[in-house]
From Swiss-Prot:
This is DNA mismatch repair protein MutS. PANTHER family: DNA MISMATCH REPAIR PROTEIN MSH1, MITOCHONDRIAL (PTHR11361:SF34), DNA MISMATCH REPAIR PROTEIN MUTS FAMILY MEMBER (PTHR11361). InterPro entries: DNA_mismatch_repair_MutS, DNA_mismatch_repair_MutS-lik_N, DNA_mismatch_repair_MutS/MSH, DNA_mismatch_repair_MutS_C, DNA_mismatch_repair_MutS_clamp, DNA_mismatch_repair_MutS_core, DNA_mismatch_repair_MutS_N, DNA_mismatch_repair_MutS_sf. It comes from Sorangium cellulosum (strain So ce56) (Polyangium cellulosum (strain So ce56)). ATP binds at residues 662-669. The lineage of its organism: Bacteria, Pseudomonadati, Myxococcota, Polyangia, Polyangiales. CDD domains: ABC_MutS1.
Length: 918
């Protein structure tokens, strides 16, 4: 708004409030943190919102006046914590700082917004998860006109920016399903969606990202290069841009434009656009991620996930890389084998592995620390951590170089024929040693920066520059002099006093200090005649005179300003040191990336050794054969030796569809998830929990496991099940692995059976993929008679009286019973209900008719002559409640530990339950 257009109300505002209104007008969608002295203040609607969100006291500015406005504030030194809480709630925060030193500025202090913090653009350590990337996602429609429907064809551009690590990747995906799968895989904190893609934005908002924003600004493809040049820390050449599809480049431009506008005046720490070829990865969509609990358990936590089992990395960068590999396993045979070679190398050399992991434990987060330096946000403590990490890096390299005969390994075929030791490693050295040797020999440890940081910083630098105390004594003479004056003020004054006594011959001369007069020289009346002309009289007192001199004034000035001069010098030295680190940021990040890769390989080797995993034989073939496979997560939490391993073999040229039956709790779902997790581990480049494993490459894993609804969308459990099933039938290919659990159970028996039957036929006939299909519909087992590629398997259980024992062992052939009543008993269903259920079950299994003439058994083929089951028969069919209580009490008795007196008391109790006398 131009000044001439300002309303009358604005003219009544104070100058500082006009500053506030101007800044707020530039960022109406953000909460404005307005710096006033030692506080960030918020006004009007922002103040009300923040006071409620953060439980702050709401006050008023100009209380009782016509221009009274709500106000709330937070101390500037504690602002990061409050900002983090607002970001977690999905808000943006604009930070408006004072420009310059208020003590040196007359009148109104200039202010400007220096940064807008959004959920996807965070760099503060305390607001980041050290073991996961913090992505801003940007989605572009490629510049071509399209409809609003999510099902409209692609391509779409997708870019991921992690400001904290300086990573920028971009890809082009062919359709919306792939786009959403990639968004789910990246788990961005914020998604920026082009305005012509409203359905994509709505779908993205349902994912785990905190916010899905609409990017309203048009993006002219002709200006994309200039946008990237303006934002990135180094120009991205036209040749480099030509390597990427246009939709990918446009998405990257959206991400960088948004980041640059949120950090005006600062370059984004990006040097290149990294390609991300989705065709080279094993696709795991959001549903499969959730069902398999790869990185997030059903309760939202990490415990009970595959990541929790395999992540024993010792660096934050290694943890982030492992997480990315877990969510993006490879579908490229050569890449998988290279990773497995590196893991095998560390499996085969436990001593080098241990030394490497010990050294890496001191490396810290070199990647994020170097980026913070580049952004001008690194603290003295950050640089201290960077120094410690660089100091530890040479030991990590030495550990790799210590591997015997590194670099002399012969290429080893991946057919599993080589003899294997306890750790499942092939005899002889791995071919992974050759690239490792080259990396270890050529790795730049940035020794010059390490040496400068070591010479400059104290052992434990402070968290900020406000108090000083950052640099070692002897690093800078000017700083040492200022510190010396501040530290030795008393000694310097006493030395001057002694000098003046000698010069004047006045033994009563004293150098003293008061707040009113500062430092002065006091001489008693008896010696006033000895005072030299260079002394200037300041005050007459009863006992004598007070003076000053040029020498005293100079020393007093040094003492008075020594602390400020030392702090000013330290600040200048720190800025220079941080700039030195920033200049070396590219070298530091290259070192960090390589150490992270070593960390992942050594960590997976350690997991393989401790958990008795083996190297999988990954092939381009069509077989998926696992001998004595184990579920890595269930095994972790099961008692030692209690997990029952099972064999699996799915082959596109043999049995490719397994129909698995058996009772609930027998382990059907565990078995299916186990197979999928072993495939994920193998294709991410990890050893697997099995005795042997042959993995024919899988292009995607699709799952329908468990029961859930979506109240927000108004979808029932059955609707969610059918939607997920439809996605599987649409997306599965011949190379896919499909796991389906209990399709059709959310509707009537006949409808459910019909759907399950048709789905199984479609998987086998139309798609022809490898699939595991668990069901309670025993009628489905008849499918095996129509094709040799469909096989029946069951999870074994045995009856012992009224009890059922789950053996968790896979057997050929269908299950004979479901043992549902036995499971209900284990769950604590009352005995009377169980007895009634047994009676009804017996009638159903005998082929009796239900009320209304419908046949009770799907297996039955006749309707006439069957006795009708009366569902409302008198209660004599059930055990009376008092008898049920007696039965349950007797079941709980441990006869072997029952003393005679306790037995008498028990009999009395049972008689009481039956209504008998005591």
């Amino acid at each position: 708004m131009q000044p001439s257009e300002q309303p009358a109300a604005r003219k009544k505002l104070t100058p500082v409030m006009r500053q506030y209104e101007d800044a707020k007008a530039l960022h109406p969608d953000a909460i404005l943190f307005f710096r006033m002295g030692d506080f960030y203040e918020m006004f009007n609607d922002d103040a009300v919102l923040v006071s409620r969100a953060l439980n702050l006291t709401l006050t008023s500015r100009n209380k009782g006046e016509p221009d009274e406005s709500p106000m709330a504030g937070v101390p500037h030194h504690a602002a990061h914590g409050y900002i983090a809480r607002l970001l977690a709630l999905g808000h943006k925060v604009a930070i408006c700082e004072q420009c310059g030193d208020p003590s040196k500025i007359k009148g109104l202090v200039p202010r400007q917004v220096v940064r807008v913090v959004t959920p996807g653009l965070v760099t503060e350590t305390e607001q980041l998860d050290a073991r996961a990337n913090h992505y801003l996602a940007a989605v572009d429609g490629g510049g071509a006109p399209r409809g609003d429907a999510l099902g409209a064809g692609g391509p779409y551009g997708l870019s991921l920016l992690d400001l904290s690590t300086g990573e920028l990747s971009a890809t082009s995906v062919p359709d919306a399903a792939t786009l959403l799968a990639e968004l789910a895989r990246a788990d961005p904190r914020e998604a920026l969606i082009a305005r012509d893609l409203p359905d994509v934005r709505a779908a993205a908002a349902s994912l785990a990202c905190r916010a899905a924003l609409r990017d309203d600004e048009e993006l002219d493809s002709a200006h994309v290069a200039s946008i990237l040049d303006d934002a990135a820390i180094e120009p991205i050449s036209a040749a480099a841009l030509a390597e990427h599809p246009l939709p990918a480049v446009r998405a990257a431009a959206r991400a960088l434009r948004f980041a640059r506008r949120c950090s005006p005046g600062a370059r984004i720490p990006v040097r290149r656009i990294a390609p991300h070829d989705t065709s080279g990865t094993l696709r795991i969509d959001e549903t499969a991620q959730a069902h398999l609990e790869l990185v997030r358990a059903a309760d939202g936590g990490r415990r009970g996930t595959l990541l929790d089992v395999i992540d024993c990395t010792v660096t934050p960068g290694g943890a982030r890389l492992l997480r990315r590999r877990l969510l993006s396993p490879l579908a490229d045979l050569a890449g998988i084998r290279r990773r497995l070679d590196e893991v095998e190398l560390f499996v085969s050399h436990p001593r080098a592995r241990g030394e490497l992991r010990q050294a890496l434990g001191g490396v810290g987060d070199l990647e994020r620390l170097s980026v913070r330096a580049l952004l001008g946000e690194a603290t003295p403590r950050d640089l201290g951590l960077l120094r410690d990490g660089l100091t530890a890096a040479p030991a990590a390299i030495a550990a790799v170089r210590s591997i015997p005969d590194l670099g002399k390994a012969a290429a080893r075929s991946d057919d599993g024929a080589a003899a294997r030791g306890k750790d499942g490693a092939a005899a002889g050295s791995s071919s992974g040693s050759e690239p490792l040797l080259a990396e270890a020999a050529a790795l730049d440890v940035v020794a010059d920066v390490c040496a400068e940081l070591t010479a400059a910083l104290i052992e434990r630098p402070p968290p900020n520059t406000r108090e000083g105390g950052i640099f070692r004594e002897g690093y800078d003479k000017e700083l040492d002099d200022a510190r010396g004056v501040e530290k030795n003020a008393t000694e310097l004054i006493l030395a001057l006093e002694a000098k003046l006594r000698t010069q004047t011959g006045a033994p009563s001369l004293r150098v003293k200090y008061t707040r009113v007069f500062g430092w002065y020289i006091e001489v008693t009346r008896a010696h006033i005649a000895k005072v030299p002309e260079t002394f200037r009289r300041k005050q007459t007192v009863a006992t004598g005179e007070r003076y000053t001199s040029d020498e005293l004034d100079e020393l007093a000035d040094k003492i008075e300003h020594a602390g400020a001069r030392a702090l000013e010098r330290e600040t200048a030295l720190f800025d220079r040191l941080r700039a030195l680190v920033a200049k070396s940021e590219g070298r530091l990040r290259a070192l960090a990336r390589k150490l992270a890769a070593w960390d992942v390989a050594a960590a997976l080797a350690d997991v393989a050794h401790r958990n008795d995993y083996v190297r999988p034989h990954v092939t381009a073939g069509e077989a998926l054969a696992i001998r004595d496979g184990r579920h890595p997560v269930v095994e972790r939490y099961a008692a030692a030796g209690h997990f029952v391993p099972n064999d699996t073999r799915l082959d596109l040229s043999g049995e490719r569809l397994w129909l698995i039956t058996g009772p609930n709790m027998a382990g059907k779902s565990t078995l299916m998830r186990q197979v999928a997790l072993i495939v994920v581990l193998a294709q991410m480049g990890s050893y697997v929990p099995a005795r042997e494993a042959e993995i024919g490459l899988v292009d995607r894993i699709l799952s329908r496991v468990g029961a859930s609804d979506n109240v927000a969308r108004g979808e029932s459990t059955f609707m969610v099940e059918m939607r997920e099933t439809a996605e599987i039938l649409r997306d599965a290919t011949r190379r896919s692995l499909v796991i389906l659990d209990e399709i059709g159970r959310g509707t009537s028996t006949y409808d459910g059976l019909a759907i399950a039957w048709a789905v199984a036929e479609h998987l086998f006939d139309a798609i022809g993929c490898r699939a595991l299909f668990a069901t309670h519909y025993h009628e489905l087992t008849e499918l095996s008679a129509r094709a040799p590629g469909i096989a029946n398997y069951s999870v074994a259980a045995r009856e012992h009286g009224d009890d059922v024992i789950f053996l968790h062992k896979l057997e050929a052939g269908p299950a004979s019973r479901s043992y549902g009543v036995a499971v209900a008993r284990l769950a604590g269903v009352p005995e009377g209900v169980l007895a009634r259920a047994r009676a009804i079950l017996a009638t159903l299994e005998s082929g009796a008719a239900l009320p209304g003439g419908k046949h009770a058994s799907l297996r039955g083929r006749t309707r006439g002559g069957a006795a009708q089951l009366d569902l409302f028969a008198p209660a004599q069919a059930a055990v009376p409640p008092e008898q049920s209580a007696v039965i349950e009490t007797l079941r709980a008795v441990d006869v072997d530990r029952l003393a005679p007196l306790d037995a008498l008391r028990l009999v009395a109790k049972l008689k009481g339950l039956l209504g008998g006398g005591g």
